[in-house]
Amino acid sequence: MTKKRIAVIGGGVSGLSSIKCCVEEGLEPVCFERTDDIGGLWRFQENPEEGRASIYKSVIINTSKEMMCFSDYPIPDHYPNFMHNAQVLEYFRMYAKEFDLLKYIRFKTTVCSVKKQPDFATSGQWEVVTESEGKKEMNVFDGVMVCTGHHTNAHLPLESFPGIEKFKGQYFHSRDYKNPEGFTGKRVIIIGIGNSGGDLAVEISQTAKQVFLSTRRGAWILNRVGDYGYPADVLFSSRLTHFIWKICGQSLANKYLEKKINQRFDHEMFGLKPKHRALSQHPTLNDDLPNRIISGLVKVKGNVKEFTETAAIFEDGSREDDIDAVIFATGYSFDFPFLEDSVKVVKNKISLYKKVFPPNLERPTLAIIGLIQPLGAIMPISELQGRWATQVFKGLKTLPSQSEMMAEISKAQEEIDKRYVESQRHTIQGDYIDTMEELADLVGVRPNLLSLAFTDPKLALHLLLGPCTPIHYRVQGPGKWDGARKAILTTDDRIRKPLMTRVVERSSSMTSTMTIGKFMLALAFFAIIIAYF
């Protein structure tokens, strides 16, 4: 039987994992990457490319290595927990080499259009027109996986800032920022307090005369380094913690989180406290920002009302003169210009079943991969989406009726609207564990903690109490990986390894305390398992 051919659009992280998912399901992937290399967002370049997100030279990823790795390919133990962008890209290269993925990629090839075949209602096939070196080519595919991400088009709302056209200094979007060298001795305004805005404020303040961080709403600032030096996302991403938070509800969870955040520094005193709750925004992670603020090198300001030739006037009436540069860290928008009307994006909103499948197609042969902004790592979600999509393409899984899918899409959108502050930034939000467990159920790889409690209690304990890493979804079901158990049980070793650069005598009291703690947890384990289910 002839293998089904699947077009994979984009050679970034979602594209790489999608290629591998196709191969694992016996499909034939052909990946189109318009640049000459893999990596997508994580491939640093001095000169930004149109239609592709661009990172600055110093970017450190916000999710730790255990939470962001591919499910059957742990990141090397000597790599730091939070990696520089060059190390992230190197990991992707290692992954592509390990699973021989590059042979499926056609580099320097742009996808011009993706259209239904005339007999789409029965065949589900697509006509894909591509261009390479000035030559266009049309091929027919049995399925399409769109892996172009959501950091594609810089969102630059200049119309919201009267007078900017008169401003004599330089102004640009954060995608065009590369390093702080050109800002020595200057007075700089950063507009926006997302992750890019916070990072740029910190970095530029090391050379600038003064940095002003302008924010409309304020933000809750989380840090990468959590209690006892563990990565914060590792500490907050266990199934048990997630279960407890579900029981407590959003109100108590917000109260606890805000108290913990304010113990680090008082957000009201630092001028950052927003009106919304901590879990009503996509997290802004920055370990250094409070230090720059308390040192006076970064000053927090409200929203800019208008610009003059050399100054910024803020909504509270205050004014800052002699401004040399304005950087708009105002995020991105996304679209799919090569797709026909079957997929529409309106104000950064898109209707997708489980954030993957358009509900209005006669045949489920088009999947959007990685179009989610999770409270956690996106890589493992993209991978699980790919595993599910390829099962659907192959006919191993089916989708509900169009009406059922539309009803669920509406419900999911209502939940987003209810929880999050209205913002272009929050249109594709999703909780990490909820999303992973939901996708794992669809794929058939969610670990059965109840059965494992009797057959492998040690592993079950780690699955419940430890961080919910991507490797959990290789323990059972399709695509099971023989190395999953060992990798899960050695998670803590990989976290500690890069920090062990000096021999330190371990406290005996700490060791005994940990032993007692583990014993108590073991005693309560079966009760917890039963409660969880």
From Swiss-Prot:
UniProt xrefs under InterPro entries: FAD/NAD-bd_sf (IPR036188), Flavin_mOase (IPR000960), Flavin_mOase-like (IPR020946), Flavin_mOase_5 (IPR002257), FMO-like (IPR050346)
Keywords assigned: Endoplasmic reticulum, FAD, Flavoprotein, Lipid metabolism, Membrane, Methylation, Microsome, Monooxygenase, NADP, Oxidoreductase, Phosphoprotein, Transmembrane, Transmembrane helix
Modification Phosphoserine, positions: S54, S58, S280, S401
Organism classification: Eukaryota, Metazoa, Chordata, Craniata, Vertebrata
Name of the protein in question: Flavin-containing monooxygenase 5
Expression (tissue specificity): Expressed in fetal and adult liver.
EC supergroup of this enzyme: oxidoreductase
Modified residues (Phosphotyrosine): Y56
Family, as annotated: Belongs to the FMO family.
Reactions the enzyme catalyzes: N,N-dimethylaniline + NADPH + O2 + H(+) = N,N-dimethylaniline N-oxide + NADP(+) + H2O; NADPH + O2 + H(+) = H2O2 + NADP(+); heptan-2-one + NADPH + O2 + H(+) = pentyl acetate + NADP(+) + H2O; octan-3-one + NADPH + O2 + H(+) = pentyl propanoate + NADP(+) + H2O
Residues carrying Dimethylated arginine: R5
GO CC annotations on file: cytosol; endoplasmic reticulum; endoplasmic reticulum membrane
GO biological process: lipid metabolic process; regulation of cholesterol metabolic process; xenobiotic metabolic process
E.C. number(s) listed in UniProt: 1.14.13.-, 1.14.13.8, 1.6.3.1
GO molecular function: flavin adenine dinucleotide binding; monooxygenase activity; N,N-dimethylaniline monooxygenase activity; NADP binding; NADPH oxidase H202-forming activity
Domain of life: Eukaryota
Annotated positions binding NADP(+): S196, G197, G198, D199
Annotated residues for binding of FAD: G10, G11, G12, V13, S14, E33, L41, W42, N62, T63
Alphabetical list of Pfam families matching this protein: FMO-like
Modified residues annotated as Phosphothreonine in this record: T284
Function: Acts as a Baeyer-Villiger monooxygenase on a broad range of substrates. Catalyzes the insertion of an oxygen atom into a carbon-carbon bond adjacent to a carbonyl, which converts ketones to esters. Active on diverse carbonyl compounds, whereas soft nucleophiles are mostly non- or poorly reactive. In contrast with other forms of FMO it is non- or poorly active on 'classical' substrates such as drugs, pesticides, and dietary components containing soft nucleophilic heteroatoms. Able to oxidize drug molecules bearing a carbonyl group on an aliphatic chain, such as nabumetone and pentoxifylline.
Record-annotated membrane-spanning stretches: 513-533
